[in-house]
Amino acid sequence: MKIISRVLLAGLLAGIVSSASAQGTAGAARWPTRSVRVIVTFPPGGSTDAVMRIVAQYLGERIGQAVVVDNRPGAAGAIGVNLVAHAPADGYTLLLGPGGAIAINPSLFEHLDYDPVRDLVPVSAVARAPFVVMVANDAAAPASFAELIARARARPGELSYGSGGSGSAMHLTGEQFRHSIGAQIVHVPFKGSVLAWTTMVNGQLSMVWVDTTTMNGALKSGKVRVLAVTSRERSSLVPGVPTVAEAGIPDFEMIGWFGLFAPAGTPADLVARISTDVRHVLALPEVRERVFATGNEAWGSTPEALGAFVRSELAHWARVVRETGARPD
């Protein structure tokens, strides 16, 4: 009787697994039957929002349903991430997760209501861009990144840098720069990168670390110069500008990025279906061109590749926080 019971139990379990698998496959085949919502953790009008709206337009055309951008800013991205983490795992609520909320917050904040690895499933990378260091476009500012380093080392505590906010990726990039060259540089956080660079050109800061979208707007003013870019190799987003590594700080690489995530528990075949559609959109020449115009590089990936990247970013930013002692104000 025990043998028969085991056989019956094994058959029952196999049937359950087979049924669940079939339901998942059928769900992926039917998706979507209604509009899809993508949570963006920034307010309307910024580059992250702009990129998602570009992708949403073309993705909606491909899947035959509207893709609606829902802006949920606040709490360093935690509001939007939490919303998706607790949403039904059915493919109808997705997250455009920025590197800060996904990879930096876990190291900066002791008590987060979410775990990006536990609560989210990677779908596809969407876009990326390096950061840059800018100085005022005047004779008093350093002529090169090497000269900036020399000044910082020669004048402990006299130089200052601005960022778009305490705990931001640009803040941590500035701290890693300070740590790497062994200099004392004062951090001045602002509520937004535009205020940081306009303060700098008025003579109240030595430098600013900003993203390439902010850089593009600042360069149009003619009042700033870009000294270096934080990508491992020179970037087409910042043509002709040397990397930080070229100036003598080896292995210095910091990039901003955002990717598409689904709630944990979303069926793997549905995740694969969404990822395929998103990557198709990001490969379109007109989409790549429009994303580039926002100051970002379109960047699609498989779910597995994004998952591996997120794990590497979590380790990277944890090391930066540990080495620099940076904390949000």
What do these predicted ranges mean?
Residues 1-6:
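Positively charged n-region of N-terminal signal peptides that target proteins for export
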Residues 128, 215-283, 312-315:
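C-terminal lobe and pocket-closing loops
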Residues 86-92, 107-195, 244, 257-290:
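Hinge/capping helix and adjacent helix->loop/strand transition within the periplasmic-binding protein
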Residues 96-101, 127, 163, 193, ...:
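Beta->alpha turn/N-cap motifs
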Residues 7-19:
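Bacterial N-terminal signal peptides
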Residues 101-111, 171, 176-180, 207-241:
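A ligand-binding cleft/hinge motif common to bilobed small-molecule-binding domains
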Residues 22-118, 158, 182-207, 300, ...:
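N-terminal (or domain-start) structured segment
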Residues 33-35, 179-180, 220, 243, ...:
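An extracytoplasmic/periplasmic, membrane-proximal ligand-sensing/linker region
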